[in-house]
C-alpha cells in the first residue's frame, strides 16, 4: 500500500535511465568582456577578451580588439596592477638566476686557472647556444657559386656570381657552344686577367719583401732629386688627395721637409715608405702625360708610357720592403702607406694582389682602433683624419669585393666610428682648403657621397645574394637561370631593394651633379649629352664625373646577373628583362660619358679607374648583343660598342691595354655579326618544301627563335596593335607591310590555333643545351609575312612598351 522511496536520487535516476544517454555537463560560463569588438557587436554575437577575438580569427577578418586592453573600471585597474607586479617579480627572478649562474661559471673558471696556470676565456651565450645547434650548421647548403676562370695558372681562384670575371666566363661558354669552337679560341678569356701587357714586367710578390732581400741590402731604385720628387708629388693634391682624403697636407709637408734636413744639396732624402709609394702612384699617373704630339708615333708613345711605369714600380717595391719591418709596431703613417699601395695596385689592375693587401691593411687599422669611437682627449683634427682613413678603407673594400664577387672584409656591426663630415668645420680640420664657389658642397662632399652610395648598393647586393641562397638552398640547380620563376622572383625582390639607391640619387647635392643638355637629368640613362662646366675647378669636375661613373658602374654589377644566354620567354620574366635592359642602359651611359669627356676635355686623362669602368661597360654591352641579336635595344647597343672602341682608341696612347682591349672587342663583335647574319639568313631563306602548319614539323617551325622569346610582353592580347616603332633592320619593306596589314585586320587567335592542348600551343622554352645542339632555328619568311603569326600573338612584345624599360634609371 505504501511505496518505498529511495533517498539516493542519483542511483534511482541511474537505474531508471540506465539505457539512456548520460546527461551532458553544463556549459561553462563564458568570460565577461568589458566591450565586444566592433564586428561582434554589429552581428550581436558573443565576444571574448582575446586579441583578436576568436570569432574574428575564425573568419580571418580584422578585429578592433588589437590594442592593449585599457582599464575602464576599478576592478580592472587592480587586475592590471597585479599582473604587472607578477611580471616584475618574474623578471627579477630571472635576473637573480642569471647572476647565480654567472658566479658559478666564474668560480669554475677560477678553479681551472688556479690548477693549470692558464686563463680560459668564457664562452658567450651565443657560442654556448651554437653547440646545441650544430646539426643546423652541418645541414647548411651552399647557394649560388662562382665559376673559376679557365686556364688558371695559380689554382682555383674564386670569382663570385656578381663579378665581371664570372660574366666573362658565361659569355665565353656561350660563344664556344654557339660557334662550335673551344674556349681557348674565343679570345675573351685573355681579358679576365685585365690584360697583362698593361702591368709592369716584374709583378710585386712576397719575395720582394722577403727577409733575404732585405738583408742583402740590394736596391736598384734610382733616387730622384728633390725638385723631381716635388714635381710628381704636386700631382697628388689635385688628383688622388681629392678622391682619397687620408693625408693631412700640413703634416705631410712638415714630414717631407724633415726628410731632407741635414742633407747635402746633391744628396738623397731619408728612407720613407710613404713618400716612396706616393711617388709610385704619382709617377704612374704622370707617365700618361708623357706622350708625343706626332700621330705617327702612337706605337712609340705606348711603349714609352709602359716603360715610364717601371720607375714607379721600383719605388713601390722599395716601399714594401720598408713596410715589412713596421708590421709589429704600426703607425698611422704606415697605414697610410698601405692604403696608397692598394690604390697603386688597383690602378695597374692587380686586383687580387690589392684585395689580399687590403686584408693586411684592415688588420693594421684594427690594431690602431680606427674602427672604434675615438678616445677622450683625442684632438679633433686627428679624429677626423682617422675617420677619413677608415671609411676610405671601407670604400676600397667594397669596390674590390664587388668587382671580384667576394665577401666584404669589413663587418659594419663591429664599427662604432662615425661618418666623416663635409662642413666648413671639417674642411678646417682637414688642413686642405679648396674653394669651389658652391655653398652646398666642399671638396670632402665627394668622399661622403661615395660612402653613402656604396653603403646603399652593398646592402642591395647583400640582400640579393642572401635571397639567391635561400631560393637555391635545397635545389640541385647551381645558378638562377634554370628556373624562370626563380629569376622573376629575384627580379621582383631586387626591384624593391633598389629603393635605397633611388633615395641616394635624390639626396645628392645639386653642385655634385653633372648638368645635361636639354631636359636631361643627372644620374639618368636618357643618353643626353653632358653640359660640361669647364669653369669649375679641375678637382670638382673630376669628382662630379667619377661619382656618376661609380653610380652607373655599381648598378651594372647589380643588374648584370639578369643577362641570360640565351634568354627565355619574356612572358614569364618581364621584370627580369627590365633589369636586363636597365643594365644595358647604364653601360651605354658610361660609354657616352667617357667618350664625350675624353674627346672634349683632359679631366679624366690618365685616370685608371675610367678604363676599368669602360671595360665593364663593354662586357655588359657585348653580353646583351650576343644574348639578344634581334630586339629593339640591340641597334643602340651595337652603336655603343663602336663608340666604346673609339673611346679605347683615345686612351690607347697612354694605356697600352686599351689597344688590346679594342682589338678584342672588334673580334668578339665580328662573332656577334656572324650570329646576327645567320639569324637574318634564316629569316629570308625560303624553304623548298612547305609542311602543314598543323603538323608536328609545322608546329615546331612556328616556335619563335630564342632571341625573340627574350622580350615578349607580360600582358598578352588576342590581337597585335598597330606597330608604331620601326622593326629590326633584318625585316624587308614588303614583310613590314604584310605585318601591318595583318595587325589592322586581326584574325581571332582561336581560329588560327590548331585543335591541340594548351600545352602544345604555348611556345616551349629554349634551353641553352637545346639551342646549341640545334643551332639557330630557321624561321621562314612567312612568320614575318603573317602566314605563321601564331607565336607573335602569344608572346610578342608591344614595341611601344620598350620605353618603360629604357627610361628607367
Swiss-Prot record:
InterPro entries documented for this protein: Fungal_SecMet_Regulators, Transcription_factor_dom_fun, Zn2-C6_fun-type_DNA-bd_sf, Zn2Cys6_DnaBD
One family name in Pfam for this protein: Zn_clus
Keyword Zinc: yes
Localisation per UniProt entry: Nucleus
Swiss-Prot/TrEMBL GO biological process terms: DNA-templated transcription; positive regulation of patulin biosynthetic process; positive regulation of transcription from RNA polymerase II promoter by galactose
Uses, biotech or industry: Patulin was originally used as an antibiotic and specifically trialed to be used against the common cold, but it is no longer used for that purpose since it has been shown to induce immunological, neurological and gastrointestinal effects. Genotoxic effects of patulin with dose-dependent increase in DNA strand breaks in brain, liver and kidneys have been detected in mice. However, more recently, it has been proposed that patulin might also have anti-tumor properties.
Keyword DNA-binding attributed: yes
PROSITE patterns per record: ZN2_CY6_FUNGAL_1, ZN2_CY6_FUNGAL_2
GO terms for cellular component: nucleus
Coiled coil spans: 71-107
Keywords: Coiled coil, DNA-binding, Metal-binding, Nucleus, Transcription, Transcription regulation, Zinc
Renumbered residue ranges of the record's region Disordered: 1-28, 118-146, 199-225, 683-710
Annotated region of DNA binding: 37-63
Known function: Transcription factor that regulates the expression of the gene cluster that mediates the biosynthesis of patulin, an acetate-derived tetraketide mycotoxin produced by several fungal species that shows antimicrobial properties against several bacteria.
Subcellular location, principal: nucleus
Name of the gene encoding the protein in the UniProt record: patL
SMART domains attached to this UniProt entry: Fungal_trans (SM00906), GAL4 (SM00066)
Compositionally biased residues, Polar residues: 118-142, 207-216
Originating species: Aspergillus clavatus (strain ATCC 1007 / CBS 513.65 / DSM 816 / NCTC 3887 / NRRL 1 / QM 1276 / 107)
Superkingdom classification of source: Eukaryota
This protein's name: Patulin cluster transcription factor patL
Amino acid at each position: 500500500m505504501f511505496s518505498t522511496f529511495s533517498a539516493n536520487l542519483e542511483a534511482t535516476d541511474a537505474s531508471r535511465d540506465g539505457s539512456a544517454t548520460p546527461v551532458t555537463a553544463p556549459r561553462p560560463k563564458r568570460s565577461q568582456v568589458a566591450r565586444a569588438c566592433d564586428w561582434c557587436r554589429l552581428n550581436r554575437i558573443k565576444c571574448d577578451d582575446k586579441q583578436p577575438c576568436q570569432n574574428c580569427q575564425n573568419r580571418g577578418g580584422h578585429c578592433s580588439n588589437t590594442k592593449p586592453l585599457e582599464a575602464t573600471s576599478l576592478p580592472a585597474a587592480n587586475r592590471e596592477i597585479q599582473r604587472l607586479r607578477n611580471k616584475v617579480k618574474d623578471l627579477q627572478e630571472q635576473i637573480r638566476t642569471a647572476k647565480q649562474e654567472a658566479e658559478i661559471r666564474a668560480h669554475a673558471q677560477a678553479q681551472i686557472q688556479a690548477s693549470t696556470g692558464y686563463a680560459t676565456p668564457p664562452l658567450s651565450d651565443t657560442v654556448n647556444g651554437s653547440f646545441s645547434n650544430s646539426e643546423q650548421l652541418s645541414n647548411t647548403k651552399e647557394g649560388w657559386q662562382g665559376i673559376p676562370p679557365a686556364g688558371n695558372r695559380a689554382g682555383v681562384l674564386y670569382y663570385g656570381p656578381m663579378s665581371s670575371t664570372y660574366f666573362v666566363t658565361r659569355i665565353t661558354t656561350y660563344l664556344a657552344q654557339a660557334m662550335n669552337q673551344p674556349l681557348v679560341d674565343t679570345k675573351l678569356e685573355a681579358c679576365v686577367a685585365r690584360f697583362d701587357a698593361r702591368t709592369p714586367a716584374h709583378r710585386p710578390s712576397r719575395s720582394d719583401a722577403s727577409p733575404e732581400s732585405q738583408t742583402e741590402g740590394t736596391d736598384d731604385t734610382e733616387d730622384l732629386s728633390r725638385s723631381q720628387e716635388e714635381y710628381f708629388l704636386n700631382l697628388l693634391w689635385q688628383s688622388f688627395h681629392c678622391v682619397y682624403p687620408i693625408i693631412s697636407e700640413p703634416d705631410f709637408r712638415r714630414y717631407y721637409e724633415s726628410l731632407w734636413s741635414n742633407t747635402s744639396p746633391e744628396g738623397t732624402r731619408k728612407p720613407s715608405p710613404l713618400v716612396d709609394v706616393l711617388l709610385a702612384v704619382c709617377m704612374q699617373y704622370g707617365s700618361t702625360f708623357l706622350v708625343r704630339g706626332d700621330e705617327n708615333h702612337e706605337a712609340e708613345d705606348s711603349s714609352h708610357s709602359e716603360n715610364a711605369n717601371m720607375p714607379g714600380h721600383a719605388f713601390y717595391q722599395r716601399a714594401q720592403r720598408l713596410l715589412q719591418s713596421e708590421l709589429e709596431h704600426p703607425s698611422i703613417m704606415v697605414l697610410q702607406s698601405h692604403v696608397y699601395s692598394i690604390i697603386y695596385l688597383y690602378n695597374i689592375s692587380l686586383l687580387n694582389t690589392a684585395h689580399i693587401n687590403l686584408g693586411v691593411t684592415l688588420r693594421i687599422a684594427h690594431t690602431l682602433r680606427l674602427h672604434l669611437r675615438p678616445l677622450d682627449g683625442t684632438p679633433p683634427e686627428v679624429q677626423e683624419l682617422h675617420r677619413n682613413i677608415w671609411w676610405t678603407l671601407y670604400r676600397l673594400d667594397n669596390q674590390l669585393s664587388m668587382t671580384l664577387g667576394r665577401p666584404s672584409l669589413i663587418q659594419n656591426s663591429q664599427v662604432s666610428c662615425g661618418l666623416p663630415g663635409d662642413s666648413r668645420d671639417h674642411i678646417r680640420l682637414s688642413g686642405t682648403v679648396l674653394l669651389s664657389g658652391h655653398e652646398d658642397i666642399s671638396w670632402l662632399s665627394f668622399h661622403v657621397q661615395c660612402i653613402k652610395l656604396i653603403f646603399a648598393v652593398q646592402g642591395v647586393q647583400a640582400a640579393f645574394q642572401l635571397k639567391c641562397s635561400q631560393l637555391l638552398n635545397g635545389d640541385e640547380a647551381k645558378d638562377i637561370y634554370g628556373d624562370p620563376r626563380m629569376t622573376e622572383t629575384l627580379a621582383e625582390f631586387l626591384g624593391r631593394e633598389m629603393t635605397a639607391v633611388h633615395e641616394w640619387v635624390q639626396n645628392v647635392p645639386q653642385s655634385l651633379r653633372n648638368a645635361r643638355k636639354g631636359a636631361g637629368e643627372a644620374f639618368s640613362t636618357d643618353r643626353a649629352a653632358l653640359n660640361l662646366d669647364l669653369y669649375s675647378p679641375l678637382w670638382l669636375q673630376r669628382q662630379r664625373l667619377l661619382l656618376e661613373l661609380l653610380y652607373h658602374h655599381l648598378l651594372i654589377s647589380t643588374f648584370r646577373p639578369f643577362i641570360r644566354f640565351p634568354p627565355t620567354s619574356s612572358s614569364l620574366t618581364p621584370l627580369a628583362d627590365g633589369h636586363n635592359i636597365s643594365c644595358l642602359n647604364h653601360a651605354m651611359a658610361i660609354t657616352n660619358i667617357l667618350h664625350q669627356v675624353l674627346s672634349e676635355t683632359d679631366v679624366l686623362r690618365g685616370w685608371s679607374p675610367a678604363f676599368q669602368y669602360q671595360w665593364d661597360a663593354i662586357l655588359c654591352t657585348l653580353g646583351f648583343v650576343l644574348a639578344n641579336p634581334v630586339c629593339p635595344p640591340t641597334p643602340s647597343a651595337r652603336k655603343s660598342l663602336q663608340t666604346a672602341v673609339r673611346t679605347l682608341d683615345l686612351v690607347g696612347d697612354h694605356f697600352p691595354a686599351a689597344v688590346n682591349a679594342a682589338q678584342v672587342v672588334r673580334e668578339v663583335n665580328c662573332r656577334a655579326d656572324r650570329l646576327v647574319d645567320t639569324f637574318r639568313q634564316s629569316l629570308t631563306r625560303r624553304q623548298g618544301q612547305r609542311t602543314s602548319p598543323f603538323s608536328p614539323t609545322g608546329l615546331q617551325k612556328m616556335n619563335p627563335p630564342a632571341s625573340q622569346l627574350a622580350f615578349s610582353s607580360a600582358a598578352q592580347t588576342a590581337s597585335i596593335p598597330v606597330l608604331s616603332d620601326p622593326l629590326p633592320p633584318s625585316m624587308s619593306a614588303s614583310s613590314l607591310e604584310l605585318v601591318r596589314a595583318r595587325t589592322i585586320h586581326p584574325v581571332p587567335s582561336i581560329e588560327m590555333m590548331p585543335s591541340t592542348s594548351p600545352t602544345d600551343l604555348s611556345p616551349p622554352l629554349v634551353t641553352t643545351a637545346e639551342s646549341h645542339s640545334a643551332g639557330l632555328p630557321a624561321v621562314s619568311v612567312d612568320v614575318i609575312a603573317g602566314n605563321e603569326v601564331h607565336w607573335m600573338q602569344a608572346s610578342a612584345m608591344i614595341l611601344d612598351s620598350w620605353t618603360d624599360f629604357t627610361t628607367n634609371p
